[in-house]
């Protein structure tokens, strides 16, 4: 009996260690692919080295992360398609002013739509996977661990933290655009010059807010990279 129990314990230990190995390998592959947001992630979540509940848990977690990454990257592709990175291009705005801002109106509408869609998809993924936990043929303790893990993942999700800042930037951009449409301005030396000092101050304040928000995003990104590099060295 002692020998049988010892063998079972050793098998469980070996399976646990293999689970860690597989998850580390797969997460590294996922991270590498996720950096290229121009195309969907295509990660094989299955691995023959795992069996039983280790296989189920691995595939469950990897599928959750893949769907989150793909939702985020699709959102980034939609921002690029909307030419969001050219919003404050002075030449573009000056040209668009002559067209009653048709391009900028569409740009902001497209970005708002993409943001709403991503927010909805993000919440849907989380709810779907919380429900899927109950379908896994694992013990009650493992289900509770997965529920806690998904809850902690959502709270610590740095991509979503960045998204919440991006929403603030969009709000600021809409305020800036309102000023551009409402008050006369002209282009001078690649700058936007309003005729009245009050509008200059308001526009500049909004622009400074955007710069600060972008700096926050960069800080989070650098922190993420440092944390991941630390994990890979361990």
Give, region by region, the residue ranges found by the protein language model.
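Leu/Val/Ala/Ile-rich N-terminal alpha-helices, chiefly Sec-type signal peptides and the beginnings
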Residues: 2-104
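Residue-identity detector for glutamine
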Residues: 5, 9-11, 17, 29, ...
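Exposed alpha-helical structural elements
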Residues: 18, 56, 60, 74, ...
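Generic cytosolic/nucleocytoplasmic N-terminal low-complexity/intrinsically disordered segments
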Residues: 25-27, 131, 222
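Amphipathic alpha-helix face/heptad-repeat signature
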Residues: 57-60, 64, 107, 111-114, ...
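Extended amphipathic alpha-helical interaction segments
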Residues: 80-193
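Extracytoplasmic/luminal low-complexity segments enriched in Pro/Gly and acidic/polar residues
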Residues: 168, 172-234
